């Protein structure tokens, strides 16, 4: 059986997912897309080399009888409404992050899904599908380093545009760590503080860069995450877990080591798409398989809500400079 996909939003990530589902993955066919720029959507389909219905309205894609499942890759503020529409239509939906623009919006999606009575939502957190993170989690769950005590993490980008602001370091960048570190430790955040070291000269007036985010979890694990989005040298993701009996590090991406001109060197990636391209493939193939089987298993609406609750506390901590509580309600039995 081929899963017939409708894609809402044909911007950069939407086009990547259309290409991926049409040319790389198995078991799915993109049959409909929507975008406010119809001509741009048609041009994107032509470049990718597929034929699909093109709508101006995402709701038309949701309601189409030719569409079995949905990918929401539209403008961030529209994610909530299209995800809610998919739930109402009883169709599985893969929603790129953010699930909604606020924790309250995420909670509305959670409540709608619980009321429907079936898991229909997967959030686009790809890091749990990365082979390096999976290997690191296996080391932890197998008890090879004992109980985790501390995590030292970094999220570094070579540069960001001037439209990128201080709060986006949380909502656009740290949001990935907020999800994957919960998954990695199987723990919830208790509190957070954000501190600002000396700023790099490469930043601009609306961005304080770098930032260091300090978490305590309910089990007492201490986590520090460095966010440095103008590091200049490349795209670099680091994660070190300090356990009772040893230390485990996230493996570096595979790269050729060169001995040349009296130097030993290994290239560092500069683009996030290259760093996690395989994880995107695994993530979407899992969604296709699960949606076809009628049971989703990936990052849930509750995971999207939990990340949003933590992000809101981080934003508050950016402004207060103090330690802010992260108050996540008990996980509903529906998501256990």
From Swiss-Prot:
The keyword Oxidoreductase applies. Keywords: NAD, Oxidoreductase. Transmembrane segments: none annotated. InterPro entries: Gfo-Idh-MocA_inositol_DH, Gfo/Idh/MocA-like_OxRdtase_C, Gfo/Idh/MocA-like_OxRdtase_N, MI/DCI_dehydrogenase, NAD(P)-bd_dom_sf. It catalyses: myo-inositol + NAD(+) = scyllo-inosose + NADH + H(+). One of its GO terms (molecular function) is nucleotide binding. It is an enzyme of class 1 (oxidoreductase). Its EC number is 1.1.1.18. Pfam families: GFO_IDH_MocA, GFO_IDH_MocA_C. Signal peptide: none annotated. SUPFAM superfamilies: Glyceraldehyde-3-phosphate dehydrogenase-like, C-terminal domain, NAD(P)-binding Rossmann-fold domains. One of its GO terms (biological process) is inositol catabolic process. Involved in the oxidation of myo-inositol (MI) to 2-keto-myo-inositol (2KMI or 2-inosose). Homotetramer. PANTHER family: INOSITOL 2-DEHYDROGENASE, PTHR43593. Belongs to the Gfo/Idh/MocA family. This is Inositol 2-dehydrogenase. It comes from Erwinia tasmaniensis (strain DSM 17950 / CFBP 7177 / CIP 109463 / NCPPB 4357 / Et1/99).
